[in-house]
């Protein structure tokens, strides 16, 4: 009875409990029931326990909701993990030297990289992309084309990976800054190394042929008759491509369609590096001032004329400027492919000043003095080597110390005098460095090369100063120079100023004497050179042009690429590019590029790296894998193409495997023939060749005499034979059928179109004008009325006025045939037609056009038609 009575009560209680009710208070209910728990009646005990359980459950639900609320509002425990994410997000900020670019609908990573003159890999690195896929509206960081890297961006770092200077700089910051925790210093320094401005490092450029697997070279494309265009040559294991600069004057004038070319690597038959161009036509179009390879390359070579002493002084003054002014230039030149490897720079660094000395200078706070120390140390080392009068060791050290002090005082007083003194000192030291033992150890052919040797040494000295300058110290020097101009002078005492002034005067008088002697020597050399080379009043112009020619050969080499078929143009459609390749199939496929001298070794190493083995492992068969083989001199074929001058001008050449074996076979055959001729041995091949030649001469005339359905009133038999040799192969063997003739069908263009109905062969139109001249055109399709031009590259025009001449398709455009009810035209471009006829077939006109590159076919541009014949091949 107790259970039956209590069970409905429990159900009623459980139904009345509402957790979400606003007036429900489980604590109050529990407080009311607690005194009843001590009462003796047993039947009420289950009800009290149930109420207590309900109260306990209701207390758990609010705590669960609070945990959810705490989870979504982030408490201190969750902030630790999310702080890491936020820090990671905040660390990816906009890199220096970049701008934001919003991806458009038709953009891809390759097209964006091409638009901003970079590579897809660099965009992936800059934006930390996980794939190469981009979506419309995505914001990417791209290199800013107008950004000029400052001194703070190190020229020895690349955006791809932090190099050894970065890590050493980070370690250096750890040791010199004890207040900064090491774990905080390392990521910040590494981040600045990974995300600098878009600067190509010297080391990464040296290694890009082996790590990046492509070469990107600023060069000039030397065309045949269309000028010389600057651009970028991209060499990969699969393709070779030249992309012209859009700011080039010829590109702006003619468009980039003429100059953008590419070809697969397997089409390259040979790649050779020459000291000079062998093709006379291309050599004539080569500008003399090609030494200006790009806007930044070799920016000071243009100033050199050789015999002008003032220009020599200005060049050496430029080379002797302080590092604060030359640091931005070194950064720019690292962009323009000036390459110095770490192995090349390390002996210079050891010779100039040790890293311990630099660290000591930097840790003492004299960053400006350390920068001056690098320049002055080089000055001192060169001066000590070249000095004929011995300088004591203590004087050298005092002089070095004093010049450093002079460098720190130059911002306070007597600024102009001190700057002039430092420049003059550096001019003198440059002269001394050249006139010392280095001049004796370097092989100089005659006195005429002394001026060029002086220029090379000054350039190399300037480059070594720029490359050896630690970027961190240069940046710190620039900052302290701009901020603490007044403080540096106050730090020096009066005694050091007096000592520095005395030593500066002593040093100036000593070096100016040697400067004067060196100037006199240079003037004597230039006068001797002028006497030998100048024979007229224009001698100065000739000598300067000759010096420019020497500079060009010294600064550039010429890359010649010979390919199996013409390179495809990249800025035209696929159909147009294919048709242009077909049009140029009979031409010589050579492409010349002016390449900086320091990049020639990179090209050679790149071609050699991707060369396969000559033979397979087990069998004696040749491998079909594409690659290149170095051509040795004993393996070169003595053909007409390979003259002695060409062999002398060529530095190296690599050829494809197929070309290599072709040359070997040609060499063996030629040597065998030469031996037989010398021994007067008649071979079976000679006998057969003579017999075949006579048989061919007899058969040629018969094979090129087609059968005509009607006798021609305009063409003679020999003219028919000449025309037959140039007809498309699909017409050979078919008889000639006269489908239209003015004497048979009348003079009407509409009648001409009607006679063409149902034909499916090329047609040959022969015209005779009132002057008795015979000319015409071959149409690849039957003539018809069309809305636009039609036809293929088989179309050509010809003339027998005064001699037989055929003008085939040049590939410039595809304006082959155009038919209207009122006119018929062949060729086009520039508003002119190669051949134009009116609707009455009475009046005609001929003019040169781009489609065929023809001259005027008739004797006069305007002519009157006397007779027309049209032949089909069926």
Swiss-Prot record:
Q: Which residues are in the LysM domain?
A: 99-142
Chain positions found as Phosphothreonine = 119, 341
Q: Where is this region: Mediates oxidative antimutator activity?
A: 551-578
* Locations listed in the record: Mitochondrion
Q: Which residues carry this modification: Phosphoserine?
A: 91, 201-202, 204, 294, 334, 336, 346, 496
Q: Which InterPro entries match?
A: LysM_dom (IPR018392), LysM_dom_sf (IPR036779), TLDc_dom (IPR006571)
Q: Does the keyword Protease apply?
A: no
Sequence ranges of Low complexity compositional bias: 151-169
- Residue segments, region Disordered: 1-89, 151-194, 299-406, 431-537
Stretches of Basic and acidic residues bias are at 64-89, 347-362, 452-466
Induction or repression = By heat shock and oxidative stress.
Report keywords, A-Z: Disease variant, Epilepsy, Intellectual disability, Mitochondrion, Phosphoprotein, Stress response
Q: What is a single molecular function from GO for this protein?
A: oxidoreductase activity
Q: Which domain of life is it from?
A: Eukaryota
SUPFAM superfamilies the record matches: LysM domain
What are the coiled-coil residue ranges? none
Q: GRAM domain location, by residue?
A: 208-275
Any one GO CC term of this protein is: nucleus
Q: What function does the entry list?
A: May be involved in protection from oxidative damage.
Regarding protein family, the annotation reads: Belongs to the OXR1 family.
Disease field = Cerebellar hypoplasia/atrophy, epilepsy, and global developmental delay: An autosomal recessive neurodevelopmental disorder characterized by infantile onset of hypotonia, global developmental delay, delayed walking, and severely impaired intellectual development with profound speech delay. Patients manifest cerebellar atrophy and childhood-onset epilepsy.
Q: Tell me what this protein is called.
A: Oxidation resistance protein 1
